[in-house]
Structures are given as C-alpha cells and as structure tokens.
Amino acid sequence: MSITIKLGQLAEFLGATLRGDKDKDITGLATLEEAGPGQISFLAKPQYRKYLVDTQAAAVLLKPADADGYTGDALLVPDPYLAYARISHFFDPKPKSSAGVHPTAVIAEDAQVDPAASIGAFAVIESGARIAANVTIGAHCFIGARSEIGEGGWLAPRVTLYHDVRIGKRVVIQSGAVLGGEGFGFVNDKGVWQKFAQIGGVTLGDDVEIGVNTAIDRGALSDTRIGNGVKLDNQIHIAHNVQIGDHTAMAACVGISGSAKIGKHCMLAGGVGLVGHIDICDGVYITGMTMVTHSITEPGSYSSGTAMQPSAEWRKSAARLRKIDDMARRLQKLEKAVETVTCADNRSSDG
C-alpha cells in the first residue's frame, strides 16, 4: 500500500507551524538516520540530535527550540513524539477489511452480527453473541456464547473469547490472546485438589489494546475488569477477579495474581509480578522485574531486586547478602556494648 500526503496537510492535521514547502509529497515515516526522500522523521530525544544535520528526510517534526540551525523543511510542534504517533496512522500498511461474512465462518442462528462488521474465514460465533458495527474479526477467531464486541473493535486472527466476555468500543486484540479462560481456582481436600467453578466473566472498557498471547482469566464470582484505555503488551497474564483502572499500561511478561486491584494511570514495566489480594493506588510506576508483595498506597516509582553489575561484582554482592543476618546480629551486639560503655562513662562523669 502506497500513501502520499502533502506536508501542508500534515501541518494542518497537527496544528503545527510549517516551515518549508506545503506542497511537498510525504510518502512515509522513518528515523532521522534511516529516512530518505519523501519520508518524514522526528527528533524526540537529545541523543539523536547528532543525526539531524545529515538526515535525508523530506521533513522533520521538531520542537521550536530544536529548530535553530536546521535548514530543511520542518513541522514545529510541542511534542514531536506525540505528533509522530498521530500521523503514523496515515501510513499504516495494515490491510483494511470489508464488511461481510466469509462463507466458511460459522455463526449461531441467534447471534447478532451487524451488517457493517467483517467476519473472517473459519471464524466461529456462538449462541447469543453480539457483534457491533465496524468490528473486524480475523480468520480462525472464536467468539463464545453471549460474548459482546463493541463498535469498531479489531480482532487479529486466532483470538479466543470464551463465553460471557464483554468488550467495549474500539478495542484491539492481537493474535493468540485468550480472554475468559478459567481462573486458577482450587481448594485442597486431604491432599487432593478440588476445582472451583469460575462463574464470572471478563469486562473490557473502551479503547483497550491487548498484545499477542496475553491471557485474561474470567472471574471466579464477579467479572475480571479492565478499564477504559488500558494497554497490555504481549504475554501478560491477568488472573481471575483482577481489576485494572483506566489508562494503566503494562509491558511484556507482567503477571498479576488473583483479586489484585490496580489503579488508574499506572505503569508496570516488563516482568513485574504482583501477589494476589493487594491494592495498587492510582499513579504508580513499577520498574522492570519488580516483585510486589504488599499494597501500595502512595503514588510514585517503586522497585525491588538488584540492578545489573559485572558478574564478578555481583557474585561478591551475593556472597555478602547471605551474611546479612549474621552481620546484623554482630552489629546489635556492638551497639549494646557501645551503649554499656557510654552509660558507664556517663555515670563516672556524674560522680
């Protein structure tokens, strides 16, 4: 797919200050280092400024403060990275689907599919499901009984929604994602695991995005709930009864244990783990590989573990770590000895 748009049109769309030829054709996006004629680029971080002088880009998205000394065509904006994100959709090569149902799709008689929806090859839509207008369901997707997909949703091939999964508007779900699988609920009866029926569902708000091979389990009693605007990366696990607040984002391989509650506008970096039945307040940032073992009640940044070191230094630190209990006991003895001596000296001075 080839897209051409005038630089002036991009300026108008962004509300940017245009410096250069408004009729210049823009055919794509690229980094400063790799951009060629016809492509627009952006300068978002100071470390990439060194590429600005020699870039072959047709135009560059710049902050006004970064435009001094650059003689090429530019669009001046407050946030070049945000501007890049906004115009990237003009050049998205993702194929556009057409309304209609592929002849190999299997749809229950009582399922409701809007005529403006697109249902791909070998998709299965079960009894009582409802598919709204302008929804795209890719090939080999499975939509379980009574599940609902709101207007403008997009499901890549091989997405699975079990029964009673309710999805808001404009939700994007990537391949391999599974929503509504049974939660991990068992009780031990004299050494034998007995299963809890997982009778809740899954509810997603509007504008949610879910990455490849991410799993969101259904609730044991009430629904597992994902708020509006939540962004989940690839290979994330959300256990039963978890609640995630609006506009929270999680990077790959995060694991959230059952019944945890995460607030609004939080960010969880890659590999973060949460134990179950804890609460995370709004506005929390958790750094990569952190293990969260108790509730967080104050906004801010939180970390656990040790940062990377050269191997030899790390081994020394690990050896010292094993001695911490012994060192603490020795320190307590020293503190008591110092206190005894100090008290004796004070008594001598008083006498």
Swiss-Prot record:
GO terms for cellular component: membrane. One of its GO terms (biological process) is lipid A biosynthetic process. The keyword Repeat applies. Keywords: Acyltransferase, Lipid A biosynthesis, Lipid biosynthesis, Lipid metabolism, Repeat, Transferase. The active site is at residue 240. PANTHER family: UDP-3-O-ACYLGLUCOSAMINE N-ACYLTRANSFERASE (PTHR43378), UDP-3-O-ACYLGLUCOSAMINE N-ACYLTRANSFERASE 1, MITOCHONDRIAL-RELATED (PTHR43378:SF2). Catalyzes the N-acylation of UDP-3-O-acylglucosamine using 3-hydroxyacyl-ACP as the acyl donor. Is involved in the biosynthesis of lipid A, a phosphorylated glycolipid that anchors the lipopolysaccharide to the outer membrane of the cell. HAMAP family: LpxD. This is UDP-3-O-acylglucosamine N-acyltransferase. It comes from Pseudomonas syringae pv. tomato (strain ATCC BAA-871 / DC3000).
